């Protein structure tokens, strides 16, 4: 069986820059050219959001992107079809970077567990991040995902106790995903009680209690913040800022141009 792209990438000694993108945002037809632009501009891993009608853990930008994605015809079946085309180079240059799906469990349950894993693997999906899947209840799903060589990523937050950090580190296949602050996705402002120093101490604590790599997301919007997070973590995730920078695009080509221009400012 071919080695998982994420597993292969994480063996390299490099700091990672991950892009979060909501399919078919801001206009229908944007996904393939945007994926190409992100790959060409240096995205190491691309997270694709699974649009959901009630994304309670997301900030307003990602909520709006999800609603527009659904309005533009994206379902989980459609998303896998788009990824398959991207992997084959149909409608864009062949996409070879790892692709991770991030979303809620409901669409996967509706799809059917093994059916989804089969179709996702065939499409070229490398991993899954399901924020509402508790690690304590994930054992059976982890075993099935392992059978498909699918990476599964779990979340760590600033209030996660050390023993739970260690459990999450052990259960995450290749890396874990740290929320930088206690907030909805894309909130750059620190929450009450959070300071730059407290966030740094939190990430140092995560490092002490993990053996695998971890990335940091939520609220990272420019090169300065990326480089700051790289001091403590193995990767930085930029999502809301990317969506904001392409939101005004009226065509797929303009969305791709704006995505590429923005992404190059982060490297």
Swiss-Prot record:
Q: Which Gene3D superfamilies does the record cross-reference, listed alphabetically? A: Aldolase class I
Q: Which Pfam families match?
A: Trp_syntA
Enzyme Commission identifier(s): 4.2.1.20
Reactions that this protein is recorded to catalyse: (1S,2R)-1-C-(indol-3-yl)glycerol 3-phosphate + L-serine = D-glyceraldehyde 3-phosphate + L-tryptophan + H2O
User: Record's GO cellular component, any one?
Assistant: cytosol
Please state the pathway this protein functions in, per its UniProt record: Amino-acid biosynthesis; L-tryptophan biosynthesis; L-tryptophan from chorismate: step 5/5
Write out the similarity annotation.
Belongs to the TrpA family.
PANTHER family in UniProt? TRYPTOPHAN SYNTHASE ALPHA CHAIN, CHLOROPLASTIC (PTHR43406:SF1), TRYPTOPHAN SYNTHASE, ALPHA CHAIN (PTHR43406)
Report the function annotation for this chain: The alpha subunit is responsible for the aldol cleavage of indoleglycerol phosphate to indole and glyceraldehyde 3-phosphate.
Q: What is this protein called?
A: Tryptophan synthase alpha chain
Q: Which organism is it from?
A: Chlorobium phaeovibrioides (strain DSM 265 / 1930) (Prosthecochloris vibrioformis (strain DSM 265))
